């Protein structure tokens, strides 16, 4: 017995001591993976900067984005007074791009929020209960997927009328089936796991299983797809505004600014370049951020 205790003590003494701050939590592992991706980190910083600019755009903008007119410098290019130049009505483009970030980002984020809320609910129900409920939801999704997203959004706006609120609804509608399919697929896999059977065996209700066991298992996929979907929604909202179905002049929304710039693109290309560049960089940043989140959250990717 003494020999056994001596050996056990020797083994314990040989084991390295692990300090509390050296324990790797899931958050530490995620951050370790994510910070190694320089493109994703750059995109994350850009998105954070964009959010800050969008929140404080009205205070940051040097001029009123809607009611300031410099009639002496119509269509003038970038200068020290007007960093992005002036449009055909004398409005400062830099101020309008800043305020446009507020409108375009809000439209994209709110549309995806609606899509993820409804789509996640439908996906959980379809994947968990299956049967006729699953078939009904998936057939509706198939019908929505049969139409190009922008065409479906145009049809919705044509029924509801123009305006940024209706654009958000239209973009949200064609985001719903994408999230529903994603969550349904994850739910079908998770419901077969042994921990779900264990929860059922101790009498857990369907609601408890869905909210406490299955939904947390789908969060990482939802976060990644949510991030990447924001870029798609911003493009869709800008496209509708460009077609005259979204934000209406003089609202400084990026798509609406491109619509107004069409007549002056030849003589004053800067009027269209800066709103287009804002859309391009924003969408690129969200896509790169989504790629980085996917790589950091996927346990199959080593590094």
Swiss-Prot record:
> Per its UniProt record, what CDD domains does this chain match?
TM_PBP2 (cd06261)
Q: Where are the transmembrane segments?
A: 40-60, 105-125, 144-164, 165-185, 222-242, 266-286
Q: One cellular component GO annotation, for this chain's record?
A: plasma membrane
**Which positions fall inside the ABC transmembrane type-1 domain?**
101-290
Xref: Pfam families: BPD_transp_1, OppC_N
User: Which Cys pairs does UniProt list as disulfide-bonded?
Assistant: none
Give the UniProt keywords, A-Z. Answer: Cell inner membrane, Cell membrane, Membrane, Transmembrane, Transmembrane helix, Transport
In the bilayer, the protein is annotated as: Multi-pass membrane protein
Supply one GO molecular-function term: dipeptide transmembrane transporter activity
According to its UniProt record, where is this protein located? Cell inner membrane
Source species, domain of life: Bacteria
Similarity annotation: Belongs to the binding-protein-dependent transport system permease family.
- In UniProt terms, what function does this protein have? Part of the ABC transporter complex GsiABCD involved in glutathione import. Probably responsible for the translocation of the substrate across the membrane.
Q: Which NCBIfam families match?
A: PRK15082.1
Subunit = The complex is composed of two ATP-binding proteins (GsiA), two transmembrane proteins (GsiC and GsiD) and a solute-binding protein (GsiB).
Question: Mind telling me what this protein is named?
Answer: Glutathione transport system permease protein GsiD
Q: Which organism is it from?
A: Shigella flexneri
